[in-house]
């Protein structure tokens, strides 16, 4: 499977939301919340954007406290680790403000403990520097938790919400076209889409299996009939493989 970044519909929605946040009227309302079930490409897309823009990328951790968060942020910025308390905070503010560096917090549910104390620190940082923050929700109840009255000051900083959806058939075809080292016929693309339900991880796993079959059989192009009766995607919930079925006369 090729290491290529595919610009799917979710990527385009994310880019549009970033542009809207950049054009915001209220400087303090500079947060973007990215939501959606796992395997929809949230982290991959946001990580790509962070790398392109020079954003600070942090992955939330179960043990996060405000001081732990600030220490990790300072570490990413290569700030003198002997600084503590107000001195460390001021150094972070100075660096982020001077370079207008966005901050990404992936798995933001881990920043919700103790009435979102970590996000209160992030709010102070973005308010003082007027920079953008991107929050990536790894679970589906983050939006509900952010809607609590006690968190209205934090929620008011969110200017845009992007909810990632499963890839449609067109996006699945685009992923197959750009990531596969072998040509995948439209009928097999449709089967990949059906079995994967448009989720990125199963799509990539299916592509890897198709490539392996093509290499074993020296096929420049793989059709649905070529994989009849073989496993394409594994359904872990039912604990059994999903086999490719070909209609009678389809071979």
What are these regions (language model features)?
Residues 47-51, 75, 124-127, 212:
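Short, well-ordered alpha-helices that flank and scaffold nucleotide-derived cofactor binding pockets
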Residues 16, 20-25:
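A structured, charge-rich N-terminal accessory region that forms the first stable segment of a protein
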Residues 65-71, 80-131, 147, 167-172, ...:
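Mid-core helix/loop region of P-loop NTP-binding domains shared across ATPases and GTPases
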């Amino acid at each position: 499977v090729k290491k290529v970044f595919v610009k799917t519909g979710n990527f385009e929605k994310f880019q549009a939301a970033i542009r809207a946040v950049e054009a915001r009227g209220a400087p303090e309302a500079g947060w973007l919340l990215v939501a959606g079930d796992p395997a929809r490409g949230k982290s991959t897309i946001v990580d790509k954007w962070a790398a392109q823009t020079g954003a600070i990328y942090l992955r939330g951790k179960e043990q996060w406290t405000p001081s732990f968060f600030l220490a990790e942020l300072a570490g990413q910025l290569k700030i003198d680790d002997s600084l503590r308390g107000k001195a460390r905070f001021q150094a972070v503010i100075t660096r982020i403000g001077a370079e207008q560096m966005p901050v990404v917090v992936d798995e933001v549910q881990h920043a919700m403990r103790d009435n979102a104390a970590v996000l209160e620190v992030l709010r102070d940082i973005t308010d003082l520097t007027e920079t953008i923050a991107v929050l990536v929700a790894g679970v589906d109840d983050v939006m509900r938790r952010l809607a609590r009255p006690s968190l209205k000051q934090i929620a008011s900083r969110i200017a845009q919400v992007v909810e990632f959806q499963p890839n449609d058939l067109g996006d699945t075809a685009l992923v197959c076209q750009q990531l596969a080292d072998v040509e995948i016929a439209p009928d097999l693309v449709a089967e990949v889409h059906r079995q994967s339900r448009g989720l990125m991880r199963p799509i990539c796993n299916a592509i890897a299996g198709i490539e392996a079959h093509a290499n074993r059989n020296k096929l420049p192009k793989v059709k649905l009939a070529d994989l009849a009766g073989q496993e394409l995607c594994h359904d872990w919930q039912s604990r059994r493989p999903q086999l490719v079925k070909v209609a009678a006369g389809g071979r």
